[in-house]
């Protein structure tokens, strides 16, 4: 009987030790993960340790981020109590985006949790005009998709009726592609909708704007012409494909 007790003692100790590990939890608030905020907003994270055992040992707690917390100078860490550590990002920038780790050490054991933070550029168009109405033939028309973000941090993609607009011929781009110039404007050819989509490279945020040129009659004429061309092309392809 004594030998059996001695054999079971390590097993009992192992079970008790594992159970003690499960009683320690580390959590980060807010509960939403990732945290997403526009540039310039304040972001607050709170890391908490829940410890139900009674030995009274206080955890050592730190915040970490790949590349360091002090790259932008916007991050401040505050100890709220022995089991709670806060992190504040003031006047947040895109560079403050990333994965933030809260690490706690209790005895020889290290616990960790993480929170994804995404700071995105709020893409706002400077020119609000969406319709030009009647445009004189042979005139030059400029359509602006300039935004509040820095020009070198965005990419602008232009389309007309679903097809990409490339520079050349009567189309020219200025201001790193944010302004489209249509030279020698011809209503029966150039009227219609022009769409730009602006992408912010670092944060991945985007915005879309559609500008309409020409009167209703001119737009309908161009749309009808495009439908006819598309129909003729389909018929032509089917005839020659079957032959």
Swiss-Prot record:
Q: Which cysteines are joined by disulfide bonds?
A: 47-102, 145-196
What tissues is it present in? Expressed in head and tail body wall muscles.
SMART domains xref list: IG, IGc2
Which is an annotated Pfam family here? ig
Keywords attached to this Swiss-Prot or TrEMBL record, sorted alphabetically, are: Disulfide bond, Glycoprotein, Immunoglobulin domain, Repeat, Secreted, Signal
| Phenotype caused by lack of the gene | No visible phenotype. No defect in the positioning of ASI and ASH neuron cell bodies. No defect in the positioning of PQV, PVP, RMEV, HSN and AVK axons in the ventral nerve cord.
Q: Where in the cell is it found?
A: Secreted
Glycosylation sites noted in the Swiss-Prot or TrEMBL record: 91, 142
- Residue ranges constituting the Ig-like C2-type domain according to the UniProt record: 30-118, 133-212
Q: Which GO terms describe its biological process?
A: homeostatic process; synapse organization
Q: Any idea what job this protein has?
A: Probably not involved in maintaining the position of ASI and ASH head neuron cell bodies and ventral nerve cord axons of PVQ, PVP, RMEV, AVK and HSN neurons.
- Kindly provide the name given to this protein in its UniProt entry: Zwei Ig domain protein zig-6
Q: Which organism is it from?
A: Caenorhabditis elegans
Gene name per UniProt: zig-6
């Amino acid at each position: 009987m004594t030998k059996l007790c001695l054999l079971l003692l390590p097993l009992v100790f192992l079970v008790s030790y594992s159970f003690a590990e499960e009683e320690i939890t580390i959590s980060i608030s807010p509960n939403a993960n990732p945290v997403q905020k526009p540039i310039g907003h304040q972001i607050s994270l709170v890391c908490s340790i829940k410890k139900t055992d009674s030995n009274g040992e206080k955890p050592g707690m730190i915040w970490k981020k790949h590349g360091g917390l002090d790259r932008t100078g916007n991050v401040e860490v505050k100890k709220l109590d022995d089991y709670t550590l806060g992190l504040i990002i003031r006047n947040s920038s895109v560079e403050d985006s990333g994965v933030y780790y809260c690490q706690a050490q209790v005895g020889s054991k290290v616990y960790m949790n993480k929170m994804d933070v995404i700071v995105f550029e709020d893409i706002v168009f400077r020119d609000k005009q969406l319709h030009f109405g009647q445009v004189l033939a042979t005139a030059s028309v400029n359509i602006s998709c300039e935004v509040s973000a820095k020009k070198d941090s965005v990419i602008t993609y232009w389309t007309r009726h679903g097809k990409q607009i490339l520079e050349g011929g009567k189309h020219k781009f200025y201001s790193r592609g944010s302004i489209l110039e249509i030279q020698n404007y011809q209503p029966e050819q150039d009227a219609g909708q022009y769409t730009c989509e602006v992408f912010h490279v670092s944060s991945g945020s985007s915005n879309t704007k559609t500008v309409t040129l020409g009167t209703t009659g001119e737009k309908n004429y161009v749309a009808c012409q495009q439908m006819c061309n598309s129909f003729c092309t389909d018929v032509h392809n089917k005839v020659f494909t079957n032959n």
